[in-house]
Amino acid sequence: MRAIADVDSAAQFAGLGGDSMRQAGCRIYQDYRQMAFMGFEAVLRNLSNVQRNFTIAQKALLLEKPDVLVLIDYPSFNLRIAAFARRHLPEMKIYYYVPPKVWAWKQYRIHKIAALTDAVLGIFPFEPDFYRQFGYTCTYVGNPTMDQIRRWKELSSLHGSSDPPYIAILPGSRRSEISHCLPKMLEAAKRFPDFAIRVAAAPGVDDSFYAKWLPTDVPLTRDTYSLVAHAHAAIVNSGTATLETALLGCPQVAVYHVGCPRLFGLFWRTFFKMRLFTLPNIILGREAIREKLALHFTVDEVAEELSRLLHDEAYRQRMLTDYAEIARLLGDTPAPVNAAKIIVQNINNQHEVTNTW
């Protein structure tokens, strides 16, 4: 939003979102916290709320009649809204920024995305080639995680730390994954008594939640970027955190817990279109960091890989070289700025004032 406003100072905004969007001048019709239902069971329990959110969005679109609709992630909701907008506001431009990960699974969605949008603005450098295979267009605009790391480095000192060497543990952002992952991650790290252990706390999860697993000598921190940037190595729950860890230059092993690991293997082979799981590896197209998933997420396997990360300097340097290649592939251009320029440039001949939903 701020990037669009920088390009078009007369732009006005309305939508579904949170405090940050409201502070940037957006008229909020529904707070995103009333929409965050994770998993099939949660959606079933909240079907009436889900439908109410659709109704709110539909009525707001008809009331606002914006020039542009910008969709961000959340495909099950946004694709339905896009279909409604196409039917009722056919002149409106629709852009998908941070599109669904169709390159990983639910590949069939790519046809619906192409049919319902005027442009797809991807955040991974391999996405344009993937869309091209199906005869569609996707523009890579840059990566928001790269932008965040760059801004953090500009404001932070990375001249090293006077603290003793330590292992960073990033157990995830949700309580369920923290409770499943943290105990095994701690056990693996404890096998290296020459290194201290520090744990990253997730936003919205109280310190007291971690207390049942953390010894008194293992501190909890909410400054995750600083924790990772100065760590000697890290154990990271798979997700965006693996990419953040790579861009911060910390050797890592990635883990992922599943409740039914054998069933996960069948699901992976049947539905998942990528043979790699973590973002750094997917971006590179090969395994730069070891992925300890499902049956392979054991204390022994994690500790074995951690030993190499801590003690094998040549191995560490190869990983850091791969990290540099990831940064090169992601590029330096800010994703929001590029996306804003494309959006405004494509509609500024239609209206003097941009109304964005």
Language model: regions and residue ranges:
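Nucleotide-activated sugar donor-binding and catalytic core shared by glycosyltransferases
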Residues: 1-357
